[in-house]
Each structure stands twice: as structure tokens, then as C-alpha cells.
Amino acid sequence: METITSRDNAKIKYACAVRDTEKQRAADGVFFAEGPKLCLELAKSCTPRVVYATAAALVKTPELARFDPAEIAPHVAEKLSGTKSNQGVFALFETPVPPADILNTARRILALEGVQDPGNVGTLLRSAAAFGFDAVVL
């Protein structure tokens, strides 16, 4: 496996575009995730299109090997993260498409719009699960 060492690599630029622009995410049906825990958890229900990881992250999280990750240099990880302190794992996942009839068959639906704080979304999702909601629309 060859390590991606250029911050100007086309694949890295594309991942940054997905991370930064809703238009890119919507057009390609993908979303960006960062961090080993989040990426492994998302992989249980979403299809990873590509996974990027530093050598250190691959040693720390050997479970990532099943996704055939592209190895990236630490300075490339900084570009993907936008920070110097990151966990070195990034992925693009296919956006799941809910069944077309979900709004007709679900009995309890939580609809969220314009929630500013991601922590509030997490709280609302956990509450919806605890109260037996069938669907959440973001």
C-alpha cells in the first residue's frame, strides 16, 4: 500500500470538498466522518466508500484493516481534519436512503430542522430511541 503524502492529492481534495460542502455531499450521495470509533460504528449500518488512516492509527485500531484503508501521512491527516490534533482516521460513507414508505408506516416520527448544536441532536436521538420512535427526519 502506497502512502498518500501530498495535501494536493485529488482524492484528498475531494474528501475535503465532501466535508465542507453540502452541495458535494448531496450530489454524490456521500458524507464525511472522522475518528476511529465513529467510523467503525457507522460501518455497521452504512457502506464506507473509502477510508483514510495514518500508520499510527492503523496500529492503534487494527479493525480498520477490513476496509482496506488508504494510508495517509500525518500532514495529510491535518488537512482532512483541519486541526493538528486528530485521531488519524477519516472515511467517506454512502448516505443511506430510507425506504420510500417510512413516513407512511412509522407511527412516531421525530422531525428536526435547523438544530445548531450537534450535542442537542445526539440528545434528541437518544430520547427518540428511549421513547420508541420509529424514525427520525433530519
Regions found by a protein language model. Give the residues of each.
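Residue-level signal for inorganic ion chemistry
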Residues: 35, 91, 128
